[in-house]
Amino acid sequence: MCHGYGPSRVPSPLHNRNAQTHEQSFVLRARGPPYIPMHIMGEVLTLELEQKAAAVRDTLASGVQQYGRVVYSNSLGAEAMVLTDIIWSHVPAIDIFSIDTGRLHEETYELLEKLERRYKKRIKLVYPDSESLAKLVGQQGVNGFFHSLEARLACCHVRKVEPFKRAIAGYGAWVTGVRRQQSATRALGQPVEWDAPNGLYKISPLLDWTEEQIWQYIRARKIPYNLLHDRMFPSIGCAPCTRAIQPGEDQRAGRWWWEQPESRECGLQPRVRHAVGQSHAVGQS
């Protein structure tokens, strides 16, 4: 029996139990990730958070009005759950896709099914080109990305960047869930900026949200999320390239942990940024 998400995936016993106890999973999720103090994750939205969510809705709606076709590249992380909820509830004109690299965690595929049950909608999945992927694996091996930065970037290009470029073709703007708090590179971003490498505008409506606010929103709205977050995975990507972090580590320390911090991006977040109304260059990832 096929999973419905991912290439020829067979559900595990854990997946079957989760599917049978959907209501019980909300009890598990209510605990939240261990790196977020429980006392700040209230059961209702605060006035401040309601205002921030309203600002996100306005930013997204303005993006549709100004740029026409807008698409959200859904990472399926915690921030993605906030944006998915807001888009599907308030700005349905925005399309949503996610990239299935073929190396995602089982919990990520389970999350896709939970979201479909909750919202009665399905996120469009895009995949790497099969010929390019076969060539890549033939050249560097199944896990060749561990051997050098160049090999890892080549893997990310085939599995993520190229499918991403196909998915955003024809759109006037794309939406991302990056936040300043996540890394020094992302701290330089602007809410709306021209994405020169991809030839369209980029909208980052959560840029000034804190992680605590992200989880306050998720808990108050009872939104499904990736259960890896409860195991100290604040940032989740491909299974081989993601690990849990230790207390006190940077939020993205679990991504490509064998590399230097300044290189820990996949290429979807270029570091050449041109904000609307201004421009500045800070390098290229």
Where are these regions (language model features)?
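Short, low-complexity intrinsically disordered segments enriched in A/P/G/S/L with frequent Arg
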Residues: 1-3, 10-13, 26, 33
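Absolute N-terminal positional cue centered near the fourth residue
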Residues: 4, 30, 41-44
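Intrinsically disordered, low-complexity segments enriched in Ser/Pro/Gly/Ala and basic residues
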Residues: 7-11, 24, 278, 284-285
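Intrinsically disordered, low-complexity terminal segments enriched in Ser/Thr
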Residues: 19-23, 36-38
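Ala/Thr-enriched low-complexity intrinsically disordered regions
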Residues: 19-21, 30, 281
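Nucleotide-activated chemistry modules centered on ATP-dependent adenylation/adenylyltransferase
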Residues: 37-285
